[in-house]
Structure formats: C-alpha cells, structure tokens
Amino acid sequence: MTHLAEILRTRVQGDLLFDRFSRGRYATDASLYQMMPLGILSPKSEDDIAAALDVAREQGVSILSRGGGTSQCGQTVNEALVLDNSQYFNGILQLDLENMRCVVRPGIVLDELNRALKPHGLWFPVDVSTASRAT
C-alpha cells in the first residue's frame, strides 16, 4: 500500500482503490489517452471530499474529479488521485420548478437527470451520444 493510501485510510470513509488492476480500469476513458492514476477514492460524503483535498494538498498530489469516464478528449485520466463521484455522489439534491433550477451531485448520469425532469416539461439541453453514461 502506498503512503498516500495509508494516510487516506485514516481520514476518509469512502471506498479506496490502490491496486494495479483497479487503477488500470481508471487509466482510460473514451479517448486514446492512457494515464495510470495514483489511486481512486469513491467519496461517501462531503467530508470525504474535503479530507481528500486536504491530503492531496499536504502530499503535493493532483486531484481529478471523475464520473462516467466518457470524455473523448482525455479530461478524466491523469496521474492523480481520482475522485469517482459516480458511485455515491449522484442524484438530484434540489428541484425548484418555480425558478427552473436544479441542483445535482456531480455523479448524476445525464439520462437520469432528464428522466426526472421530463414529467415537468423540462430537460437539460446537452445532447451527447454518451448521455446514458455521461455525468
């Protein structure tokens, strides 16, 4: 286990993945780029995210926020600590129909958001081919 993993295990409740196989799964997205991350944290709370940011700052490590990994330009791969928001940090926090405002967590899938908005005659107007996976 790496030093970074040891520190994070004492500071977060989320799932940590530092084995080579798991890191390899996060080394690619829909682009041609391949970059092995240092490790992966699936945060379970805002406290996990804050702690991960603190540890990254203390250790001089970059952070990479990731959801569905559907980028075709390589934005979701890097030699960094990956925060995978797709597992626990998804969903709608607030839907304010009067003001046509929606607050979501970063891991929500675009199609799921639009399914929730459709009964209200609304949709989030981003039309991508990966909407069933894109966050």
Give the location of each predicted region:
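N-terminal glycine-rich flavin-associated loop
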Residues: 8, 31-63, 85-130
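Short acidic, glycine/serine/threonine-rich loops at helix termini
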Residues: 74-79, 114-116
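Conserved oxyanion/phosphate-binding beta-strand-loop segments in alpha/beta enzyme cores
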Residues: 6-27
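Short glycine-aspartate micro-motif
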Residues: 82
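Intrinsic disorder at enzyme termini
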Residues: 1-5
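A glycine-rich phosphate-binding loop feature that marks nucleotide/adenosyl-phosphate handling sites
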Residues: 22, 72-73, 131-135
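Conserved PLP cofactor-binding pocket of PLP-dependent enzymes
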Residues: 66
